[in-house]
Amino acid sequence: MSAAKQLFKIVPLTPTEINFLQSLAPVVKEHGVTVTSTMYKYMFQTYPEVRSYFNMTNQKTGRQPKVLAFSLYQYILHLNDLTPISGFVNQIVLKHCGLGIKPDQYPVVGESLVQAFKMVLGEAADEHFVEVFKKAYGNLAQTLIDAEASVYKTLAWEEFKDFRVTKLVKEAEDVTSVYLTPVDGFKLKPIIPGEYISFRWDIHNPDITDIQPREYSISQDVKENEYRISVRDIGIVSDYINKKLQVGDIVPVHAPVGTMKYDSISKKGKVAVLAGGIGITPMIPIIEHALKDGKDVELYYSNRSYQSEPFREFFSNLEKENNGKFKLNNYISAENQKLQVKDLEHINPDEYDVYLLGPVAYMHEFKTYLVGKGVSDLKMEFFGPTDPDC
């Protein structure tokens, strides 16, 4: 991909303009979700061509509007310096790159946001507000465009590439692993453990005509020029994958990206992995690489039931093969087993790298505990939109 496209001129806001926008922060906090929900409705009606870049399930549940509202609020609070939210911004950049977001889509979002503010705030969204907001939005949009251009240059390929399904394996009663290889024979490079790939699914449903974008973690390193994803049946697309996808089917795949990557240069000798349910998928290559690096690995693995627990045999064998270097701690909710913070009391932040992924409530509980314990470099990500609740 070429150099970043310059669609917006970055013009620093004046102190007066910053104060004006920040004075509206309480309004954005209170009405932000209404604004963003209105924005998406307007945008999808006015610019239907962008629908295929958005997960419509996240629209229906309100997760995507909530995340965008949170993003706008945080941007307004940090107009002087984005450094405190740089991690959050980086997750957005990588998400956009994984989905193949293009610079030309930013003016569409900007115009739709302006219209939504006018509809929701009425006279409060006057000419002065619109002028200052457009300036601030343009600065943010071009910053993201520049950052995304830098990421695109590092990816293994541009755009989406057709992959063929080579194998389907049932890992649990509601989890299927999908093995895929490039149709054109492209040689896949080893992944960085923790990366995910984005898909564009046509699920052949007469009631759902839009292409459905989804991201799934790569659940093992590249073998035989194949990626593997492992998908739990919890939604429209995942139901299609588990029940209707067939060997030989073709699906477009974007190059891997990721925020929760294995830290291969860490000098710490121990790794603790906390995984809830299907959050185990990116942890598998992370665990394997940590063991190859000679680290002691502890897995705290929570599932609803034995029937819903994927990779049970794999982890059991891994424990046997590694002579005490890998310790598996299983927690099954149906058996009244639950990971407790007391199970993690021994974790010394100076000795352990810690990885965390699972349902939002699970992540919130253990993130709060681990950060309070002094784990300053906790490695985690979110399935779905970057969640402001965690």
From Swiss-Prot:
Q: Which reactions appear under catalytic activity for this entry?
A: 2 nitric oxide + NADPH + 2 O2 = 2 nitrate + NADP(+) + H(+); 2 nitric oxide + NADH + 2 O2 = 2 nitrate + NAD(+) + H(+)
The protein's superkingdom reads: Eukaryota
Cofactor list: FAD; heme b
Please state every residue range assigned to the domain named Globin: 12-149
Instruction: Identify the enzyme class.
Output: oxidoreductase
Q: Which UniProt keywords apply?
A: Acetylation, Cytoplasm, Detoxification, FAD, Flavoprotein, Heme, Iron, Metal-binding, NAD, NADP, Oxidoreductase
Give the region (Reductase) as residue ranges: 157-390
Q: Which InterPro entries match?
A: FAD-bd_FR_type, Fe_red_NAD-bd_6, FNR_nucleotide-bd, Globin, Globin-like_sf, Globin/Proto, Riboflavin_synthase-like_b-brl
Q: Where does NADP(+) bind?
A: G277, I278, G279, I280, T281, P282
Which Gene3D superfamilies does the UniProt record give?
Answer: Globins, Nucleotide-binding domain of ferredoxin-NADP reductase (FNR) module, Translation factors
User: PROSITE patterns attached here?
Assistant: FAD_FR, GLOBIN
In the Enzyme Commission scheme, what number(s) does this protein have?
Answer: 1.14.12.17
Q: Which Pfam families match?
A: Globin (PF00042), NAD_binding_6 (PF08030)
Site feature Influences the redox potential of the prosthetic heme and FAD groups: at which residues?
K95, E381
- UniProt free text on domains: Consists of two distinct domains; a N-terminal heme-containing oxygen-binding domain and a C-terminal reductase domain with binding sites for FAD and NAD(P)H.
What family does the entry list? Belongs to the globin family. Two-domain flavohemoproteins subfamily. In the C-terminal section; belongs to the flavoprotein pyridine nucleotide cytochrome reductase family.
Cited function: Is involved in NO detoxification in an aerobic process, termed nitric oxide dioxygenase (NOD) reaction that utilizes O(2) and NAD(P)H to convert NO to nitrate, which protects the fungus from various noxious nitrogen compounds. Therefore, plays a central role in the inducible response to nitrosative stress. In the presence of oxygen and NADH, it has NADH oxidase activity, which leads to the generation of superoxide and H(2)O(2). Under anaerobic conditions, it also exhibits nitric oxide reductase and FAD reductase activities. However, all these reactions are much lower than NOD activity.
The name under which this protein is listed is Flavohemoprotein
Q: Which organism is it from?
A: Candida norvegensis
